[in-house]
Amino acid sequence: MRTSQQAVNRVVLIGGGSVGVSYAFALMNQGVTEELAIIDLDADKALGDVMDLNHGKAFAPSLTNVWLGEYGDCKDADIVCICAGANQQSGETRLDLVEKNMKIFKEIVTDVMNSGFNGIFLIATNPVDILTQAVISFSGLPPHRVIGSGTTLDTARLRYELGEYFHLSPKNIHAYIIGEHGDTELPLWSTATIGTVPLLTYLNRSESYTTEDLDDIFTNVRDAAYRIIQKKGATYYGIAMSLVRVTEAILKDEHSILTTSSFLQGEYGVDNVCIGVPTIINRNGVSEIIEVPMNEDEQKQFNHSVQTLKGIYEPTMQMMK
């Protein structure tokens, strides 16, 4: 991995589908990286995307060098972002995808590591928590250098919904979704704040605000992907923007707190699972996992989410051996 003193950052994107190309487009528009290589099985389509992106250089904030990549380009990459894999179909849960995508990932990670890659993996493909942990196993890299998108998008969705409800900017709402990026995720209402005011206190400002509305807000967040998939076939803009946010935090050594899928080694009383939790992200990847206090009900829900992921990951990895 390159050091922070070097001027040129390189991101390699593997998987030029809707999520991957949206990520590439957002990277260029925000000027986050100087180099971007795109690898995809459909080389012609990927080359078309490269051409299309390069034609917009004159309008970008910085001149990102974009090219059709190969696995050898991973050797000098700071980040390899994997967006490849089977898509989630209507009526299919993220966990239903695990067997399809685990096999795809084993081949991809082997090819990346054979290049001499020594950077950070950023995983977007679902089920993201399970595949993030699989990449740790397949790559042999230390866990702090393998990061999943986790519940970064879910947290952004929650802040958006709360912002709409309270007529406030989502940037001033500090509330997290943690757990599986999926059906067992949970909101941390007990520690959520608006500005510096506890969310549950803020509710008392008006009789038009109710705790029952919070349940509806969370349901909207949890089920958002299903609704979007039903209407347009896939989600990609929101997750692409969340991936760019994590990429920026890494490349700029920000030490920002994001709810990535991170490997727990005793935090929250849990071992050996990747799951969405507030995490300090910097140039080295995961710097620290923040242990947010939970009430009894939240802890119970979180433990259920952990067990759900373990119940899928462990038998699936046994099948891969």
Curated annotation (Swiss-Prot):
Residues that hold substrate according to the record: Q88, R94, N126, P127, V128, D129, D154, T155, A156, R157, T235
Tell where it localizes.
Cytoplasm
What does the record give as its pathway?
Fermentation; pyruvate fermentation to lactate; (S)-lactate from pyruvate: step 1/1
User: Which biological process terms from the Gene Ontology are attached to this UniProt entry?
Assistant: glycolytic process; lactate metabolic process
NCBIfam families recorded for this chain? Answer: L-LDH-NAD, PRK00066.1
Which residues, by range, are in coiled-coil regions?
none
Q: How is its activity regulated?
A: Allosterically activated by fructose 1,6-bisphosphate (FBP).
Name its species: Oceanobacillus iheyensis (strain DSM 14371 / CIP 107618 / JCM 11309 / KCTC 3954 / HTE831)
Annotated active site residues, numbered on this chain, are: H181
Q: Name one Pfam family in it.
A: Ldh_1_N
Residue numbers carrying Phosphotyrosine: Y226
Gene behind this protein: ldh
Describe its function.
Catalyzes the conversion of lactate to pyruvate.
Q: How does this chain assemble?
A: Homotetramer.
Name the keywords, alphabetized.
Allosteric enzyme, Cytoplasm, NAD, Oxidoreductase, Phosphoprotein
Q: What is this protein called?
A: L-lactate dehydrogenase
Please list the GO terms describing molecular function: L-lactate dehydrogenase activity
Domain of life from the UniProt record = Bacteria
EC number(s) per UniProt? 1.1.1.27
Which GO cellular component terms, listed alphabetically, does the Swiss-Prot or TrEMBL entry include? cytoplasm
The UniProt record gives the binding positions of NAD(+) as V19, D40, K45, Y71, G85, A86, A124, T125, N126, S149
InterPro entries named in the record:
L-lactate/malate_DH, L-lactate_DH, L-lactate_DH_AS, Lactate/malate_DH_C, Lactate/malate_DH_N, Lactate_DH/Glyco_Ohase_4_C, NAD(P)-bd_dom_sf
* Residue sites binding beta-D-fructose 1,6-bisphosphate per the record: R159, H174
Entry-linked PANTHER family: L-2-HYDROXYCARBOXYLATE DEHYDROGENASE (NAD(P)(+)), L-LACTATE DEHYDROGENASE
